[in-house]
A protein has these predicted regions:
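Interfacial helix-start motif at the membrane-water boundary
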Residues: 66-93
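Cytosolic juxtamembrane amphipathic/interface segments immediately preceding
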Residues: 8-27, 85, 89, 163-170
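Terminal transmembrane helical module of multi-pass membrane proteins
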Residues: 147-199
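Interfacial helix-loop-helix junctions of multi-pass membrane proteins
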Residues: 119-135, 188-199
């Protein structure tokens, strides 16, 4: 007799698989965190060419123009779409030698450092506390995505490449759906609300 599908048991099992895979991938995630924070320090302390600074500022100006006039639900959806796409690409494009998640960690860390430096110069050191709520859920989700993206690329190093890739891919997909996306939903709600209220 065919066993009846139980949604709750399925979800519980997926969470167990997801957290077990994250735990087994912690060194890759820690590496991503390390890359991110090293380049955030670079962005904060080292002067950068004016052309790069202008590009970063223009990027944020473009984001502001895109979100101007959005309602709170629209703002939340906009942020969630951006972050979920970034997380997806960082994870699954990592299959190509881990290049995309590494470069994304470098770029995101550098931009955070630059923005933090600009904020401190304009509003003082305590202005950094305003940035904290924006990243409390988003950054862990992105670190997990990028870390698993780097791990996904290591299938090329083992003997049974295709089987290993399938295993990594399926586990990564489970983590993306059951861990990363929920974190990004919470992050979008918090960040969207803060932006909407002008915090």
């Amino acid at each position: 007799m065919k066993k009846k599908f139980n949604l709750r048991n399925f979800i519980d099992e997926q969470y167990k698989i997801s957290f077990s895979y994250i735990k087994g991938s912690k060194n890759f995630i820690y590496s991503t965190i390390g890359i991110f924070f090293v380049f955030s320090l670079v962005g904060f302390f080292l002067p950068i060419p004016e052309s790069i600074a202008t590009q970063i500022i223009n990027y944020f100006k473009e984001l502001v123009s895109k979100t101007a006039g959005l309602s709170l639900p629209e703002m939340i959806l906009f942020l969630f779409n951006n972050n979920s796409i970034s997380g997806f690409m960082g994870l699954f494009f990592g299959a190509v030698f881990g290049i995309f998640p590494v470069l994304s960690s470098i770029a995101n860390g550098f931009v955070l450092g630059f923005v933090s430096n600009t904020s401190v110069h304009q509003d003082g050191i305590f202005s950094l506390w305003r940035l904290f709520p924006h990243g409390i859920f988003e950054l862990p989700a992105i670190f997990i995505s990028f870390g698993l993206g780097i791990k996904l690329s290591t299938f090329i190093l083992v003997k049974d490449k295709w089987k290993t890739f399938q295993k990594f891919f399926i586990n990564s997909l489970s983590v993306y759906i059951f861990v990363i996306l929920p974190l990004l939903v919470i992050a979008a709600i918090i960040e969207g609300t803060l932006i909407y209220l002008g915090a």
